């Protein structure tokens, strides 16, 4: 028998063990996701024996992550969460015009892949998050009256390196739980080929973002050691297969590093990488990202004029490209800046 791993599976098992009718589980999930009740004792629609059993199993709160520090800017909120074993992770909430809210969540405590420009990698890898720890980050925001309009796995860690990623996505897309559309979820990867292939088969409508950062194999291997294990040419073939199978656009992230990957030669090589791939090549979209400075690395911010020139070269060649609007860099909540601290 398959072991019940997630809290929602355990909740269903508790209802069954108490020989309660199935509708009690439905009442429980509605209390969480419709009424936004975080405390089991406050779910008065449930019988006392069930509430007591839930508290004994999970503690008094539905969400297991504890916020220990919050930092806000005009459009971003960065939260430092403490987990039950004392490890810490960060998540970011972003507010856009017309009330749209997007959340960037972590999949690992730290990261072991050592991308040279990323602050998270400097912390090293501690452990994978459980599916509950991943989704509990969102529960915290939800219980605090936020709207979960879109979710991105762009926080700490490489999502495809966590075996519980797809359990988390299953929870997020379960219509009796979070009920998110697959198209409201984006998973970012540095190029873990087996993970991309699994996403293609299991959740074909989930958005996929690939971190490129250099079109040259040797330089990419220097910036991102994962390229030695999964070379760029092989990753691109896997992305082609993903597009052919799903018919969905793939977003390619390209962080602009001054004097490193911002030359005209780089722009032309990106064009060469994406052109003449096949009838699906129009479904590749480049997101140019201004580098966000951090005290963990020595790379420098690129000027807006240089980024515009790079973008212009791509567009003139027929490549779909935009310069990403950045939120949260002033509170170290933007791309590549997440790095938990024991004391903030």
Curated annotation (Swiss-Prot):
Listed PROSITE patterns = RADICAL_SAM (PS51918)
Q: Which UniProt keywords apply?
A: 4Fe-4S, Antibiotic resistance, Cytoplasm, Disulfide bond, Iron, Iron-sulfur, Metal-binding, Methyltransferase, rRNA processing, S-adenosyl-L-methionine, Transferase
Q: Tell me, which GO biological process terms does this entry list?
A: response to antibiotic; rRNA base methylation; tRNA methylation
> What catalytic activity is recorded?
adenosine(2503) in 23S rRNA + 2 reduced [2Fe-2S]-[ferredoxin] + 2 S-adenosyl-L-methionine = 8-methyladenosine(2503) in 23S rRNA + 5'-deoxyadenosine + L-methionine + 2 oxidized [2Fe-2S]-[ferredoxin] + S-adenosyl-L-homocysteine
What GO molecular function annotation could you give as one example from this UniProt entry? rRNA binding
**Keyword Transmembrane helix in record:** no
A Pfam family annotated for this UniProt entry:
Radical_SAM
Which sites bind [4Fe-4S] cluster? 111, 115, 118
Q: Which GO terms describe its cellular component?
A: cytoplasm
In short, the EC number is: 2.1.1.224
- Cofactor stoichiometry and binding? Binds 1 [4Fe-4S] cluster. The cluster is coordinated with 3 cysteines and an exchangeable S-adenosyl-L-methionine.
Cofactor(s) this protein cannot do without: [4Fe-4S] cluster
Where does it live in the cell? Cytoplasm
Further details from the record: Reaction proceeds by a ping-pong mechanism involving intermediate methylation of a conserved cysteine residue.
- What job does the chain carry out? Specifically methylates position 8 of adenine 2503 in 23S rRNA. Confers resistance to some classes of antibiotics.
* UniProt record similarity statement: Belongs to the radical SAM superfamily. RlmN family. Cfr subfamily.
Q: What is this protein called?
A: Ribosomal RNA large subunit methyltransferase Cfr
Per the UniProt record, the lineage of the source organism begins with:
Bacteria, Bacillati, Bacillota, Clostridia, Eubacteriales
């Amino acid at each position: 028998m398959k072991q019940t791993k997630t809290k929602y599976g355990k909740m269903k098992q508790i209802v069954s063990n108490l020989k309660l009718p199935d509708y009690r589980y439905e009442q429980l999930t509605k209390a969480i996701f419709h009424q936004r009740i975080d405390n089991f004792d406050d779910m008065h629609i449930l019988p006392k024996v069930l509430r007591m059993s839930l508290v004994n199993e999970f503690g008094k709160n539905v969400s297991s992550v504890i916020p220990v520090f919050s930092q806000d800017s005009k459009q971003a909120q960065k939260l430092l969460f403490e987990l039950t074993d004392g490890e810490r992770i960060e998540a970011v909430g972003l507010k856009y015009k017309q009330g749209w809210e997007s959340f960037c969540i972590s999949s690992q405590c730290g990261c072991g892949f050592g991308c040279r420009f990323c602050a998270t990698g400097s912390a090293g890898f501690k452990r994978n998050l459980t599916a509950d720890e991943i989704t509990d980050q969102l529960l915290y925001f939800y219980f605090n009256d936020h709207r979960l309009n879109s979710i991105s796995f762009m926080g700490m860690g490489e999502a495809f390196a966590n075996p519980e990623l797809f359990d988390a996505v299953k929870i997020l897309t379960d219509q009796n739980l979070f009920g998110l559309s697959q198209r409201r979820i984006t998973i970012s990867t540095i190029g873990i080929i087996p993970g991309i292939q699994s996403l293609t088969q299991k959740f074909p409508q989930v958005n996929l973002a690939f971190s490129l950062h250099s079109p040259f194999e040797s330089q990419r291997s220097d910036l991102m050691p994962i390229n030695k294990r999964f070379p760029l040419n092989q990753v691109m073939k896997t992305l082609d297969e993903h597009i052919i199978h799903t018919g969905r656009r793939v977003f390619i992230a390209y962080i602009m590093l001054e004097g490193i990957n911002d030359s005209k030669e780089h722009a032309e090589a990106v064009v060469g990488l994406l052109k003449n791939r096949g009838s699906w090549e129009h479904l590749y979209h480049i997101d140019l990202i201004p580098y966000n400075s951090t005290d963990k690395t020595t790379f420098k911010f690129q000027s807006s004029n240089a980024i515009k020139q790079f973008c212009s070269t791509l567009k003139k060649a027929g490549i779909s490209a935009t310069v990403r609007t950045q939120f949260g860099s002033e509170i170290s909540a933007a791309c590549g800046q997440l790095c938990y601290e024991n004391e903030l």
